[in-house]
């Protein structure tokens, strides 16, 4: 948590600053598999996004094998293979900071996050009752930042409501805690997020 929040780590009382750029990627196996443990809400909240990966198609697996055979994943791959170097990443981070997000878009994002805490104002009662805990204020920050990053990837210097919608599930799915009844009924966080996005007015 210290590394993710403060960009430093403390070992034996000595503080070591972490290099820039720095990011944390983690994999999470299904909780029902042996040797897996549920992360706390505070730990999950530190992750900006959560993607869900399925098994690759046969064609994708074939491509993976071909790339391995071609040396794409070697420790010292040849130059010109499309990888980003550190300077390019730092340049993209600088460009990201220049993406404009209007106050109305920030308000829109905050309303979406607030709806996860007060779902009865936005969802049918039987669905609203399935949410045990809504997303924290950190979710609003992450939603706005992810929207700006999406805008940059789309080639725009400003964020629009569609950017917020495009990243909402990735930002919120791990921050909404559902009751056991939701799993029993086959209701997912993504389903509830869709419902909220349909109910929160778009600016």
Label the model's feature ranges.
Residues 118-203:
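C-terminal engagement/docking regions of AAA+ P-loop ATPases
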Residues 13, 35, 97-100, 135, ...:
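Short coil/turn residues that cap or connect secondary-structure elements
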Residues 55-73, 79, 97-101, 117, ...:
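Non-catalytic accessory segments flanking P-loop/AAA+ NTPase cores
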Residues 76-121, 125-140:
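Conserved AAA+ ATPase small/helical "lid" subdomain
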């Amino acid at each position: 948590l210290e590394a993710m929040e403060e960009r430093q780590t403390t070992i034996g009382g000595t503080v070591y600053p972490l290099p820039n750029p720095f990011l944390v990627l983690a994999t999470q196996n299904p909780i029902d598999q042996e040797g897996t443990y549920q992360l706390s809400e505070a730990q999950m909240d530190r992750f900006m996004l959560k993607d869900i990966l399925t098994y690759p198609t046969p064609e994708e697996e074939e491509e993976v094998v071909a790339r391995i055979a071609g040396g794409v994943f070697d420790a010292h791959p040849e130059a010109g293979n499309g990888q980003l170097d550190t300077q390019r990443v730092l340049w993209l981070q600088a460009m990201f900071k220049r993406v404009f997000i209007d106050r109305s878009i920030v308000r829109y994002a905050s309303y979406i996050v607030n709806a996860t805490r007060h779902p009865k104002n936005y969802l049918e009662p039987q669905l609203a009752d399935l949410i045990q805990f809504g997303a924290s204020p950190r979710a609003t920050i992450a939603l706005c930042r992810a929207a700006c990053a999406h805008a940059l990837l789309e080639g725009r210097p400003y964020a629009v409501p569609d950017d917020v919608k495009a990243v909402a599930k990735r930002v919120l799915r791990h921050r909404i805690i559902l009751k056991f009844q939701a799993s029993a009924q086959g209701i997912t966080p993504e389903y509830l997020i869709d419902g909220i996005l349909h109910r929160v007015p778009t600016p």
